[in-house]
């Protein structure tokens, strides 16, 4: 049964993410109406990423290409979002995206679940993941590195250099859960990964040594993960976790079950 379930997951991705087509969205290709829940869009706060966790790791690298092509369409509008909302270089996205290049927060909605500036960098980590599995240096040089580098630049500009010398992602949110906060664990996990990706990519290509040193310096001074009074990994910057909370989003644990790294190994 477990093997059947595993292969069924691969089948779903194979069927809904073919090269030259759109990536898998919330309902894939199986929705039977013109419209559907959440407009059948792309949710960048774990849903689209979750769709692609089995791509490279189960030998379906070609299924990752529609996602990368889609990410490339977000760069230009994402540059405007980065500049207009954050005064930052590079590009980013927010909680939702669509085929028309939507990258801003949903301004009519509650920012506690809708504000997610790390959505763009999280998407960009899949670009490095594709290279990491394929070792396609031509892809990295011609397509991948620019996506990763510009996402890292946004991340650097979004960080707050605190008086104590550390860096934190502020403001930030734990997707769809809790308050707007200073340096939630999920945001720091994405920051660590995109900076590690940019550092490694620049080393592979032998470029941007000066900027690489900046990324390394920030990475070394990023606020560390914290353990709370229950022995849990804190979700927010302070110990406000409730052990009775059964919310479906646990993005702060992404370093334990996705390709995001808890630290450099």
What are these regions (language model features)?
Residues 40-48, 52-57:
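Acidic, His- and aromatic-enriched active-site or binding-groove loops in soluble protein domains
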Residues 1-42, 61-82, 206-209:
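Acidic/polar, glycine-enriched structural segments that form the non-catalytic walls/loops
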Residues 25-44, 89-142, 150-217:
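The feature captures the catalytic groove of carbohydrate-active enzymes
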Residues 2-5, 47, 60, 64, ...:
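Hydrophobic (often cysteine-bearing) scaffold residues that line and stabilize catalytic clefts
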Residues 4-15, 70-73, 77, 146-158, ...:
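Alpha-helical scaffold segments in carbohydrate-active enzymes
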Residues 53, 59-132, 210-257:
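Active-site lining segments of carbohydrate-active enzymes
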Residues 258-265:
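Conserved small/polar residues in nucleotide/adenosyl-binding loops
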